């Protein structure tokens, strides 16, 4: 029923008697829900998953048994670190949450666009996110926070050296890879199980490897919603994006003999690229994901959509990965915070959210410093995987690919204070003296140019992380 206007007249009943108006105002005050603290900027679509290969020898999951079987699903793509209004092409880890409506309940795949992450110790997560978000003093981006954290947590270098290459910028969701990252246990009726890592490879190919940092910045300025727009328009015109699903399988008896810990999320399950002398875990294709329908009501269908690694189905169990264990608690807890005032049921009813809610943090030192009492000690393979990646880049593409990594690192680090720069150089030297020397040289050239031109150092709020 449409509301009639409230016309001010003397000797009439007061407005507080207009219960329709009060209801409209109270609904307006409550129609928004809290923003996700991570993965705030996003978009989504509906689709289906089709089994293409028989994997019944390693799997007893109903959704994956039977070539040709199709399962409806809904997915949400997102950035990670910054707020809902940020640009999608920023140098950031990207996310993809998928909710499969199986006959045995919802099964969620909570993925990122790289096969490894910054940390293996979940106690570090709040500080990691604070380091990438806005300075609590200035409310601007501050590279000092980010690089101070990286230097104190060298297990992050594997992903940092990926993010600052051309792989760290992205121009559309349709060609983004997605990795569950964690090992899960796929169980069989006899009680046996395999450790399995699942990932999705875009059939449209990557969209970022020929892009420079300047290209990414131009895209962010010209259309900060470009990736969402591209996905929506592609689906509307019938150009449906597809991904091939792969599984990497490890027998639990073989896991101790591998040269890395499959429960350490800062390492990837190598399928033949690097480390060059490392254990290789072959991949097996088993299905195709297709996104083929846009939502009708974005807020109720996508923004209220939630995911959790704990949303499992019979035949799947979580592994002992500490990051996975922490996420299984944190995601449902975040849903209770974020959706408590919005109990409406979206078409694909979520049970868990795609965010974490870190509490307030006390800073005893300079306000932008990010520290934690729970640093886990660095191990040699933390540097080894980063070193192998750095040395592999020229073989992966060409020398220019590695050169741009150096330029991107130098551009960002040049915006930090001297104390942080020195920490970063020392940390990089543990990976490769060539890496440290080239980054130092690039930073010094930028600082000299800025001094010669009498140009003040770029403000943190304009930082290009």
UniProtKB/Swiss-Prot annotation:
Keywords: Alkaloid metabolism, Heme, Hydrogen peroxide, Iron, Metal-binding, Oxidoreductase, Peroxidase
TM ranges: none
Gene Ontology biological process terms in this record: alkaloid metabolic process; hydrogen peroxide catabolic process; response to hydrogen peroxide
Enzyme active site: 39
Cross-referenced SMART domains: Catalase
Entries under Pfam families matching the protein: Catalase
E.C. numbers: 1.11.-.-
Purpose: Catalase; part of the gene cluster that mediates the biosynthesis of communesins, a prominent class of indole alkaloids with great potential as pharmaceuticals. Communesins are biosynthesized by the coupling of tryptamine and aurantioclavine, two building blocks derived from L-tryptophan. The L-tryptophan decarboxylase cnsB converts L-tryptophan to tryptamine, whereas the tryptophan dimethylallyltransferase cnsF converts L-tryptophan to 4-dimethylallyl tryptophan which is further transformed to aurantioclavine by the aurantioclavine synthase cnsA, probably aided by the catalase cnsD.
Protein name, per record: Catalase cnsD
């Amino acid at each position: 029923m449409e509301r009639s206007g409230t016309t001010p007249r003397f000797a009439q009943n007061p407005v507080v008697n207009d219960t329709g108006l009060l209801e409209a105002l109270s609904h307006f005050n409550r129609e928004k829900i809290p923003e996700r603290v991570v993965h705030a900027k996003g978009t989504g679509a509906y689709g289906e998953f089709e089994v293409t290969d028989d994997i019944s020898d390693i799997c007893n999951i109903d959704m994956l048994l039977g070539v040709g079987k199709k399962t409806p699903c809904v997915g949400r793509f997102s950035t990670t670190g910054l707020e809902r209004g940020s640009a999608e092409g920023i140098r950031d880890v990207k996310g993809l949450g998928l909710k499969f409506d199986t006959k045995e309940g919802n099964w969620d795949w909570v993925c990122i666009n790289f096969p490894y992450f910054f940390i293996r110790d979940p106690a570090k997560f709040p500080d990691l996110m604070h380091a990438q978000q806005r300075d609590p003093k200035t409310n601007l981006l501050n590279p000092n926070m980010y690089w101070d954290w990286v230097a104190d947590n060298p297990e992050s270098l594997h992903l940092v050296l990926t993010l600052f290459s051309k792989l760290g910028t992205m121009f559309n969701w349709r060609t983004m890879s997605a990795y569950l990252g964690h090992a899960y246990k796929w169980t069989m009726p006899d009680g046996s199980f395999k450790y399995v890592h699942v990932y999705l490879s875009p059939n449209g190919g990557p969209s970022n490897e020929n892009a420079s940092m300047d290209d990414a910045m131009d895209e962010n300025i010209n259309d900060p919603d470009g990736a969402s727009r591209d996905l929506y328009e592609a689906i509307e015109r019938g150009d449906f994006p597809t991904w091939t699903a792969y599984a990497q399988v490890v027998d639990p008896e073989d896991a101790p003999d591998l040269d890395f810990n499959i429960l350490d999320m800062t390492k990837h399950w190598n399928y033949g690229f690097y480390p060059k002398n490392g254990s290789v875990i072959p991949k097996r294709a088993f299905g195709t994901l297709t996104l083929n329908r846009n939502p009708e009501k974005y807020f109720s269908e996508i923004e209220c959509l939630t995911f959790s690694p704990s949303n499992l189905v019979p035949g799947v169990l979580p592994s002992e990965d500490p990051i996975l264990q922490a996420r299984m608690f944190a995601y449902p807890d975040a849903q209770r915070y974020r959706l408590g005032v919005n109990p409406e049921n979206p078409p694909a009813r979520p049970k868990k959210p795609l965010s974490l809610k870190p509490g307030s943090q006390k800073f005893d030192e300079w306000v932008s410093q990010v520290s934690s009492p729970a640093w886990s000690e660095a191990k040699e393979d933390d540097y080894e995987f980063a070193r192998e990646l750095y040395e592999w880049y020229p073989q992966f593409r060409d020398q220019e690919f590695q050169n741009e990594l150096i330029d991107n690192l130098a551009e960002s680090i040049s915006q930090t204070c001297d104390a942080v720069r020195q920490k970063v150089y020392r940390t990089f030297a543990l990976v490769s003296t060539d890496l440290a020397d080239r980054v130092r040289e690039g930073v010094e050239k930028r600082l000299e140019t800025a001094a010669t031109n009498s140009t003040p150092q770029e403000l943190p709020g304009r930082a290009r992380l």
